């Protein structure tokens, strides 16, 4: 084999190149050391904006101290059978990915060979090696090592046998079963947990910047992991609200404020997650020029449908063939709509999204069971009624009003870390923009939520509502949606507290992986 691979022979040039990359990694590590610190313990780093921060590996988890291996090009060529076409797993703007087996350990791996003329250059290569060497989570792909022989740049990852989420959503062959509803919710919850780790556990937070269905890889049992961190950026620290950078990413997934201004925030990732979640619900691509005019862009197609819950069933993936819980569909679309708010400040935090999706993923759905047996199994989130005196939503489900939620949870607490305090703070945060004469219109200060919106939708078309329909301006509808964001945050926080109260301290570990 060495005869057909002349670059196998070691040379001073290759050795110098490898040393150069190692120096660049060390230099990049050192340069970030002076300004940032990546850690899982945020409390120890909040001593003031002038504190110097160091880039260190997280101290938690069994893999926290594992360093990336260095491989020779010979080793990786042998692992992939000289990069034969039958070993090719996929190809993108950054290069090709091959399946291989390491001769030394027998481990099955995925080898990404960067295209020297592609979109990912040496800087992105270094960023990915650095990020994945430091950040470890069950929902982030594991980096095994890298190769920097000569001008070759290769990354070695753990092998994900089920491919990418994109492979299971779009352009399915006739013999391939589509994902069922429960699996879709589980994948969404896992991907959100990976994003939550980057946003909330790393310090400073890491902005992924390239969240899309092709970058969510699936392992056994459809366990999702985020991959491809070449575009990741360290988030704002101190008093900064954003980081300014050139616009990168994939069309159809980029948040509008980032695409227009280059100002990147954690909420930019939340928007991208909303697009992926909408793909999971609808089965549509983020951008699909093969569809009819007006349906090319997934978000643009969905926005008017979000305003009328009677059209929600039309948004479900036809390949599901109606095998999904109606209430679960409504709640999933509500979460997607909140993530896709045009104003970044009104999008939920990824931690609240994790709470909502963890609940949705926990609701098992049997497509063969009678509809009544799938509706109210287990305890719902706090704003979902569990009593019989519920307002019907047409599918046997209903939502609590904010007052009923508060009465069931007891008197409001005043401590700043209590759920009630944070709930009021989140409501004020969303209402502040509407009451101050913002572009979404004025507001009365009433805490409207998802229950109010669904109640209005259920009454639409009645004689009493005919006269009011002319007053439902787009500005008011935007205000309603903003208030729905606040109520969703209330739901997430209250449900989390109920779980803690029911199972004891530390029992709600599903959001702390």
From Swiss-Prot:
CDD domains: STKc_IRAK (cd14066)
Residues reported to bind ATP: 89-97, 112
Membrane topology, from the record: Lipid-anchor
Active site per the UniProt annotation: 210
Post-translation changes: Phosphorylated by CERK1 upon elicitation by chitin. Palmitoylation at Cys-4 and Cys-7 are required for plasma membrane location.
Induction comment from the UniProt entry of this chain: Levels are regulated in a proteasome-dependent manner (at proteome level).
Superkingdom, taxonomy of origin: Eukaryota
Biased composition (Gly residues): 434-446
Reactions catalysed, as given in the entry: L-seryl-[protein] + ATP = O-phospho-L-seryl-[protein] + ADP + H(+); L-threonyl-[protein] + ATP = O-phospho-L-threonyl-[protein] + ADP + H(+)
Annotated GO biological process: cellular response to chitin; defense response to fungus; innate immune response; positive regulation of defense response to bacterium; positive regulation of MAPK cascade; regulation of defense response to fungus; regulation of innate immune response
Pfam families listed in its UniProt record: Pkinase (PF00069)
Disruption phenotype: Impaired chitin-induced defense responses such as MAPK activation (e.g. MPK3/6) and callose deposition leading to reduced disease resistance against fungal (e.g. A.brassicicola) and bacterial (e.g. P.syringae pv. tomato DC3000 hrcC) infections.
Residues covered by region (Disordered): 1-61, 365-513
Composition bias, Polar residues: 365-378, 456-473, 504-513
Residues that bear Phosphoserine: 244, 392, 401
GO CC annotations on file: plasma membrane
Subcellular location: Cell membrane
Coiled-coil segments: none
Effect of mutating residue 112 to E: No autophosphorylation activity. Directly phosphorylated by CERK1 in vitro. Impaired CERK1-mediated phosphorylation
Broad class of the protein's primary localization: membrane
Family membership noted in the UniProt record: Belongs to the protein kinase superfamily. Ser/Thr protein kinase family.
Oligomer status and interactors: Interacts with CERK1 (preferentially unphosphorylated) at the plasma membrane. Binds to MAPKKK5 at the plasma membrane; disassociation is induced by chitin perception by the CERK1 complex. Also associates with MAPKKK3.
Protein name (database record): Serine/threonine-protein kinase PBL27
Organism: Arabidopsis thaliana (Mouse-ear cress)
Encoding gene, per UniProt annotation: PBL27
């Amino acid at each position: 084999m060495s005869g057909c691979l002349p670059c196998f022979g070691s040379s001073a040039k290759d050795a110098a190149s490898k040393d150069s990359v190692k120096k660049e990694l060390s230099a990049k590590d050192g340069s970030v050391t002076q300004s940032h610190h990546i850690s899982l313990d945020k409390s120890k780093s909040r001593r003031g904006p002038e504190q110097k921060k160091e880039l260190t590996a997280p101290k938690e988890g069994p893999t926290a101290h594992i360093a990336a291996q260095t491989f020779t090009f010979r080793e990786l060529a042998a692992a992939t059978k000289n990069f034969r076409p039958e070993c090719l797993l996929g190809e993108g703007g950054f290069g090709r990915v091959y399946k291989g087996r390491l001769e030394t350990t027998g481990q099955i791996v995925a080898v990404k060979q960067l295209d020297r003329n592609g979109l990912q250059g040496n800087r992105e290569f270094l960023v990915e090696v650095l990020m994945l060497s430091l950040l470890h989570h069950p929902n982030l792909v594991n980096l095994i090592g890298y190769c920097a022989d000569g001008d070759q740049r290769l990354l070695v990852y753990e092998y994900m046998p089920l491919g990418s989420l994109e492979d299971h959503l779009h352009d399915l062959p006739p013999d391939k079963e589509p994902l069922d509803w429960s699996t879709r919710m589980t994948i969404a919850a896992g991907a959100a947990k990976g994003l939550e780790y980057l946003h909330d556990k790393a310090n400073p937070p890491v902005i992924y910047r390239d969240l899309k269905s092709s970058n969510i890889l699936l392992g056994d049992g459809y366990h999702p992991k985020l991959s491809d961190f070449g575009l990741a950026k360290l988030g704002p620290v101190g008093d900064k609200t954003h980081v300014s950078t050139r616009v990168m990413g994939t069309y159809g997934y980029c948040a509008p404020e980032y695409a227009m201004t280059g100002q990147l925030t954690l909420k930019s990732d939340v928007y991208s997650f909303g697009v992926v979640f909408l793909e999971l619900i609808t089965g549509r691509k983020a951008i699909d020029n093969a569809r009819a005019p007006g349906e090319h862009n997934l978000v643009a197609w969905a926005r008017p449908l979000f305003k009328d819950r009677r059209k929600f069933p039309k948004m479900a993936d036809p390949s599901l063939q109606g095998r999904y819980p109606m209430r679960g569909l409504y709640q999933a679309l509500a979460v997607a709509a909140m993530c896709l708010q045009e104003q970044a400040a009104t999008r939920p935090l990824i931690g609240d999204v994790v709470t909502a999706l963890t609940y949705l993923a926990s609701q098992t759905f049997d497509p063969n069971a009678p509809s009544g047996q799938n509706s109210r199994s287990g305890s719902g989130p706090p704003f979902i009624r569990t009593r019989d005196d519920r307002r019907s939503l047409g599918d046997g489900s209903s939502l609590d009003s904010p007052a009923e939620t508060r009465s069931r949870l007891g008197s409001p607490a005043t401590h700043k870390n209590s759920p009630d305090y944070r709930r009021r703070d989140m409501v004020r945060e969303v209402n502040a923009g509407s009451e101050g004469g913002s572009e979404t219109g004025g507001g009365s200060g009433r805490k409207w939520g998802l229950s109010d919106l669904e109640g209005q939708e259920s009454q639409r078309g009645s004689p009493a509502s005919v006269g009011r329909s002319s007053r439902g301006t787009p500005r008011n509808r935007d205000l309603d949606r903003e208030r729905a964001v606040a109520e969703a945050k209330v739901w997430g926080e209250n449900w989390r507290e109920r779980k803690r109260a029911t199972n004891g301290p530390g029992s709600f570990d599903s959001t702390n992986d």
